[in-house]
């Protein structure tokens, strides 16, 4: 009955091995377990636990060779997918498909595996049966703050305890970001150090190569010098030996000659001795006969002086060896050779001022130089025929700023390198040029309108310059203060520049050449309010006088010239008039003329090539308003090509406004005081025109320009 009950209670796990036991659920909190796992959950949990244990054992004993050495039968096993692991010990067929082989059932296999596990781990069967797989505990809450004092991550709930209560903490994300920044900084430093070390290693390699090159060069230098010294010594040895041999030959020849002479004398003495001995054996009579002759012969022989002194001494004079040239060669042997010729660089842009230039040169890297000798002289035309003075200066660097020069002048430079071995060859000559002198703006020639300005200047340099630059500074608005606009590449001494209307500008001019830029010229101020112009004194009739400010024309009461003035293309000779210089800009130009009520005058415009021998308005190149006062009556004429309309003006104007409108091809006159329109010419202006003024009688008129256009004029 008990076995049947066990079979009924163990439904679903009847195939489990008999020696495999589980602890009863009574070991745990049964009430809690019942609440968490209602129903048959305890049975299911035991099955899952047993299946996991089987999988663990199967993984551990997958090595067939190891199992064989232990004396246990090997099992061909493979890792099984946990999702496909059998849930019931009774599913034997499914277990066979999952990898159990050898003809054994799952119960026998599991039992053998457990026996092997107990054997290899040194456990008894009872000890194995006490093994319990604990339940997985819930994961702890991750740390979300970082204790800066302890330098460890903690949870928020722990920072209120005694351990971290007084410590400084920060959010874990912020600490992580800070740590990443520190790591990044250290990595950057490390990368920089790596780069520096790589550069240093490259530099060391270059130094190694340089050492080898210098060694080879010095070795070649020593070999060359010492070979020269040996050749010199060998030559001197040959010369001395040859001279000594000559002296030896001379001595031997002298001694040999003396030896021959001595032998001859000795033979003569012996002959005389033999002759005397023979005479002594002769008879007395014969002896006396021969004795007289022999006596004379002996007397003559004895009178002959025999030189017994040596003609040549065997000793040789001590020879003084002159090694001065060898010493010079020895002194010339240095560790460094004489430098090569320097290479003088071309002039760099903007490297000069009006009185100085910066000269640069380079030298071969393997040359050692102690100083440089820089020489220069001005470049002049060959036609001048004057000797050019040369100047020399010693410098230590490979550059030099030469001062006290003439502006906008070319100079020829060359350089020599020197060290203790000697000077180098001279470099090639290079031409440098000083910057120009600052130009001078002709303030009296400035012409402007609301849209542009025409400025002229004098170069201030004897030699031509490459170009000019005009600098403009707008001086009215605070936000534009100090902002400089430049117009560059101006080839001539004048420029027409577009500007903004109703502003004030400060203008400077600079001159440029290959050497650099000159200093700024003196400033000139320009206002783009109305049209501003000056009177052209070259066109002024001799009877007229222009005031110092250039805006008042005066005709004094003087007698006329008896002789007529010769014709001129620029100066008025018949009409007592003068022209103004209006800026050549097609637009609207306005100016005013103040006149006396009874003054005879003519105002208007005319082309530049208007005939100077004709009255204004008497040709097709001039448009004028003429006023004459006759018999207490005012007469006004608007003349063009000697024609005038019939117009009567009741109010004599004291200030006449003139509006020149190129766009609409009109020339209008106004009475400024009463804002009255007087007359308008409709004229086709194919060329630029200029204001013109004439006085028929003595008096003066004043020109007002550079003023804003009145409102009543803007409607025309």
From Swiss-Prot:
Expressed predominantly in heart and skeletal muscle (at protein level). The keyword Repeat applies. Transmembrane segments: none annotated. Residues 513-711 form the B30.2/SPRY domain. InterPro entries: B30.2/SPRY, B30.2/SPRY_sf, Butyrophylin_SPRY, ConA-like_dom_sf, E3_ligase_FN3/SPRY, FN3_dom, FN3_sf, Ig-like_fold. Keywords: Coiled coil, Cytoplasm, Nucleus, Repeat, Sarcoplasmic reticulum. Pfam families: fn3, SPRY. SMART domains: FN3, SPRY. Residues 342-437, 438-531 form the Fibronectin type-III domain. It is found in: Nucleus; Sarcoplasmic reticulum; Cytoplasm, Perinuclear region. It comes from the Eukaryota. GO terms for cellular component: nucleus; perinuclear region of cytoplasm; sarcoplasmic reticulum. Residues 229-284 form a coiled coil. Interacts with CMYA5. In cardiac muscles, identified in a complex composed of FSD2, CMYA5 and RYR2. This is Fibronectin type III and SPRY domain-containing protein 2. It comes from Mus musculus (Mouse).
